[in-house]
Amino acid sequence: MQHIRNFSIIAHIDHGKSTLADRLIHRCGGLAEREMSAQVLDSMDIERERGITIKAQTASLQYKSQDGTVYNLNLIDTPGHVDFSYEVSRSLSACEGALLVVDASQGVEAQTVANCYTAIELGMEVLPVLNKMDLPQADPEAARQEVEDVIGIDASEAVLASAKTGMGIDEILESIVARVPPPKGDPSAPLQALIIDSWFDNYVGVVMLVRIVNGVLKPKDKILLMASHATHLCEQIGVFTPKSQPRPELSAGEVGFVIAGIKELEHAKVGDTITLAGKPAAEPLPGFKEVKPQVFAGLYPVESSEYDQLRDSLEKLKLNDAALMFEPEVSQALGFGFRCGFLGLLHMEIVQERLEREFDMDIITTAPSVVYEVEQRDGTVVTIESPSRMPEIAKIADIREPIVKVTLFMPQEYVGPVMTLCNNKRGVQLNMSYHGRQVHLTYEIPLAEIVLDFFDKLKSVSRGYASMDYEFVEYRSADVVKVDLLINGDRVDALAMIAHRNNARYRAREVVSRMRGLIPRQMFDVAIQAAIGAEVIARENVKALRKNVLAKCYGGDISRKKKLLEKQKAGKKRMKQVGSVEIPQEAFLAILQVEDK
């Protein structure tokens, strides 16, 4: 065990984490030259294209250090994005050390800080690495100062590296061997293994990525998953180099994979503890928690006949994505579909994109909403995931909305616009500090405001320089109301939205006027209204198309013309009673694009 080193890499999006991982694998001979592809560990297409890591991946590398000892290095690649922060904390808790990769030309960013604090709380050894030193604008001194100011760790020994050219790779490996402590654990104690990640393989079922903390695991052992209380027979174990290689056993301190013929990803939850069914451990490893979706949206197939296909696609995605939740939902406007829960906006976009790309689905997505807690007059508390499920106003005693703590980093020239944006989003400033040129702001903002378009707005007011990270704080009472949209007097459930009372009228007027341009003209007038309860707060009309019925009358008596006009009027009236209005897809998106004042 003295020769094992478990480490992970912490970095902001695009700071060169996956490239550095490729270099380390290459240097230790994990893959032959011909098998090296860019970003070896990012196995999903969408991960490569967006340049982000979504699932944790590992590589066990053999490294011969300069004094001739051979070390077994386990690299655990972690996701870097806020939505996946639970996966990050589990990946980090499997390691004793972390490489903090900072782009020498850009300095420290928000997500790096959040993950780095997690690592420090877990008591890990953090080794700073200043990457991208091959760029002409790299400024190692400023970056080093920033690491010390913002994160508060000593960066005097930071390795200067460039993953692109391969500079500094040997120094990184040497410092891992020298500074990261070997794992602690007792091979003779009862088995305790932490599930770092799990995914579904079409051939063998669920593959679990585990870190053995105590004990030894061998094939043919009967294992027990402590959170879901399921027992399975362990069929195959091994390590990734990043290719899978079977092993006769995994013992304390090692990282590898376990295949046990599990069919449901539900059973192998990230963060759960595996132990032996015959000789179980007294208690599971600390830190396991159920991941709760924060953002909900309705997904509907464009063709209603594709409902079953959508369900199958979602089930397949769920095999690899335990945080995705969905349940059937019926909407009068859109037919049958699903109400889906996501960890955050990036997660939602990725699920949509994977549905369209991997399963070839055409889907309509309704406006994302967050979960509200509604206390009713009879004292019961219900959680509302969709605006259409909000109880009647008369029954509601109090509505509480989720508040998140947002950490923002930006160059100081953008502080003004960013603060204005946060205040417009009903934010409350908690803290502000200067670190060199960078400013660190902390705000509490309702999650509902972030879900709509906060991230896009933040990028535009700061010209792309600001970065953000958020975490859930609590539910707080809020003065929010449900705004219904009516088309010709019929409520359209899929278009309902929940808004803050101060913004409700403004948003209602905006949506209604935008809808007016999107609903095609009919043979009769179409009234578009927005209402809070029974009170209509905004209205627009889509004027009817009319045929000129008098065109065939040359001269003639006025009564003849009157008769034709009356006949047309009666026809229109009859049409209006039976006519239904097709609502185009753009109309649903109109709700998303309404700017708040």
UniProtKB/Swiss-Prot annotation:
Cross-referenced Gene3D superfamilies: 3.30.70.240, Elongation factor 4, C-terminal domain, Elongation Factor G (Translational Gtpase), domain 3, P-loop containing nucleotide triphosphate hydrolases, Translation factors
GO process annotations (BP): positive regulation of translation
Domain of life: Bacteria
EC number: 3.6.5.n1
Membrane topology: Peripheral membrane protein
PANTHER family associated with the record: TRANSLATION FACTOR GUF1 HOMOLOG, CHLOROPLASTIC, TRANSLATION FACTOR GUF1-RELATED
The protein, known as: Elongation factor 4
Organism annotation: Bordetella pertussis (strain Tohama I / ATCC BAA-589 / NCTC 13251)
Encoding gene per record: lepA
